[in-house]
């Protein structure tokens, strides 16, 4: 006997219109709900003021993310007053210790006569250029550019200091290290890295934000002193005047400037960005030859292949490197460098994937060993400054593996700021003793700090970061993944987590809830305006 079925429902045209109206009403209701949230860096901020693909997807869903992305692509960012408010920041924290202090080498000079009068403080000038922002703002008709002139003109510049020009005229090797963590530095296994990390400038509270969650955004921040949350930021920067990128700054005063990368020339649009940063850019498929064809390629082999470009130059030089050996995957099957150096890490007491991570990062040690050896033989080691920073933490490791590597709890690991701690290496063989810096600082502070150390003419108001060695307190801005928070921040007084909207003062700093709230609101405005 044949079964009978009810006829399929055939929606009428009127019914389809009814569904469409319901969908539109639901969308308007959702948009209205977003508008009710006007907390600092809340849903309203990411819907109306700043577009972030990561935040939009988490907060509003894929379809709304695509719509907002298309709007920004076609028309640019939307101007809005929905961000955190500005106003004067009233600091409620009092301490007898200057939180901006830098621990400098002790003065060992002899004195022949005691004095009752303290020495007069040295008056250093500001790191500024002759830019009249008020005049520029007065003449400007474009409201966005006018607002930018007014903003930069309102900033207090950083001052020159005892370290200004310390490395003037020296060569510079500047590296962005793929997926690097300071946890892989070991006195016995990586002696060159250890020496550089402990005998130069020692930054005890250095952080690497995720920015846009990619190598491109981490590299952009390292190279510019600015930050961006789009993986297309390098390519997009090619149309901008990157006047203060180190390649441009140093080439203007007679340096020969190279940038090297042991991956493809066009990847992330570096073929467009890096020449605009002031470099002759050499990479795979564009001049970089002699490397083993494998994944990932060897950082050590890149050093061997590129040293001849600059080591015998009669003029000062600057070599920038973007490494790739530390790239995921972190396994002995999925990473050629991990497999190559498996014997170096076989005695480590950790899981295989964490061992593989340490093994591939061993390439950085071998690269530095080769650079130091050849520079020493050429008589240029003491005339060369090394600077190294990671693009991001090794986020391809699982949460349990990250907890193992960093020694922090797995639960809530992406809300833990210690996951973003890292090491900034700034070293020269000419330094006779380390300089310890306890201030919180981050990648946006590297270029201003180097500009001051090399005695370059720059305007400190035009960076998102500051010279770490100045008397200005850096503001660490942290973007994390996986917890719905974007612009967290840290300074000498405590840390703010945007997901919970809480500021936690560090020991020794106390204030009432009302004072903290009055402090946090304008500080969030500072963070928003730097973005």
Residue ranges and their predicted role:
Residues 1-170, 186-190:
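N-terminal secretory/membrane-targeting segments
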């Amino acid at each position: 006997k044949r079964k009978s079925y009810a006829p399929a429902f055939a929606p009428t045209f009127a019914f389809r219109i009814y569904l469409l109206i319901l969908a539109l009403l639901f969308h308007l209701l959702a948009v209205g709900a977003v508008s009710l949230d006007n907390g600092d860096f809340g849903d309203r901020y990411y819907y109306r003021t700043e577009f972030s693909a990561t935040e939009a997807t988490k907060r509003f869903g894929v379809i709304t993310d695509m719509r907002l992305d298309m709007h920004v692509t076609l028309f640019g960012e939307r101007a809005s007053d929905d961000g955190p408010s500005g106003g004067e920041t009233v600091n409620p924290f009092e301490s007898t210790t200057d939180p901006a202090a830098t621990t400098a080498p002790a003065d060992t000079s002899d004195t022949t006569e005691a004095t009752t009068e303290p020495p007069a403080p040295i008056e250093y000038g500001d790191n500024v250029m002759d830019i009249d922002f008020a005049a520029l703002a007065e003449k400007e008709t474009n409201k966005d550019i006018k607002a930018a002139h007014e903003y930069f003109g309102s900033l207090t510049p950083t001052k020159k200091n005892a370290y200004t020009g310390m490395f003037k005229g020296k060569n510079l090797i500047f590296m962005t290290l793929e997926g690097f963590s300071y946890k892989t530095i070991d006195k016995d296994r990586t002696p060159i890295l250890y020496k550089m990390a402990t005998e130069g400038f020692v930054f005890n509270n250095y952080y690497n934000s995720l920015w846009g969650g990619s190598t491109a955004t981490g590299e952009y921040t390292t190279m510019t002193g600015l930050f961006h949350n789009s993986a297309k930021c390098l390519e997009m920067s090619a149309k901008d005047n990157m006047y203060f990128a180190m390649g441009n700054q140093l080439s203007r005063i007679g340096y020969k400037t190279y940038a090297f990368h042991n991956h493809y020339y066009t990847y992330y649009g570096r073929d467009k960005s890096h020449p605009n940063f002031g470099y002759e850019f050499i990479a795979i498929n564009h001049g970089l030859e002699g490397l083993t064809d494998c994944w990932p390629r060897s950082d050590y082999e890149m050093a061997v292949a590129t040293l001849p470009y600059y080591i015998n130059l009669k003029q000062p030089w600057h070599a920038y490197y973007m490494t790739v050996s530390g790239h995921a995957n972190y396994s002995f099957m999925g990473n050629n460098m991990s497999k190559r150096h498996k014997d170096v890490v076989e005695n480590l007491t950790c899981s295989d994937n964490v061992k593989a991570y340490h093994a591939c990062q061993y390439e950085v040690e071998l690269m530095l060993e080769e650079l130091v050896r050849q520079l020493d033989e050429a008589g240029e080691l003491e005339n060369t400054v090394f600077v190294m920073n990671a693009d991001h933490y090794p986020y391809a490791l699982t949460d349990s593996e990250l907890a193992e590597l960093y020694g922090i709890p797995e639960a809530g690991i992406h809300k833990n700021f210690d996951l973003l701690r890292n090491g900034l290496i700034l070293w020269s063989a000419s330094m006779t003793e380390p300089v310890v810096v306890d201030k919180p600082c981050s990648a946006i502070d590297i270029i201003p700090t180097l500009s001051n150390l090399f005695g370059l003419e720059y305007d400190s108001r035009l960076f998102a970061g500051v010279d770490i060695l100045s008397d200005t307190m850096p503001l660490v801005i942290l973007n994390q993944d996986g917890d719905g928070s974007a612009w967290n921040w840290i300074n000498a007084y405590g840390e703010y987590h945007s997901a919970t909207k809480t500021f936690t003062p560090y020991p020794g700093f106390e204030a009432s809830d009302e004072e903290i709230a009055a402090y946090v609101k304008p500080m969030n405005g500072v963070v928003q305006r730097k973005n």
